[in-house]
Amino acid sequence: MTSRFTELAVDCHDPERLAAFWCEVLDFKVIDRSEGKVEIGSWVPTVEDVRARQMPPTLFFVRVPEGKAVKNRLHLDVSPIDGSTEDEVTRLLGLGAAMADVGQGSDRSWVVMADPEGNEFCVLRTLAP
């Protein structure tokens, strides 16, 4: 018996705002929305596709009443594909991200940031040639 990683759910205050932010970051599209929920992805999942092979998971933003209180136990890592890490950090700041300090120190090869609701994520070294 096997399970597939199909989506990552993110509790948040404003699903529309976070979905829009992450669509810009990852070049994803909104693939489903309902009251208090927005799902984004790089593809429109079907049961047949997911059964046939491992596919990239979607991000599912769900409105919850409580706010974020502590550092995330799970976070996303992103890697720029067509520019430098520094240029990507600048772009993400322009989209509404913020720099974050989780005790990582300044001598790291990655940059810790937070999305507009304070969820930490890391920008890793570029994959650009």
Predicted features by range, described:
Residues 4, 36, 57, 72-74, ...:
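Residues that flank catalytic or metal-binding motifs in active/ligand-binding sites
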Residues 42-44, 124-128:
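Short beta-strand-to-coil "C-cap" segments at the C-terminal boundary of structured domains/repeats
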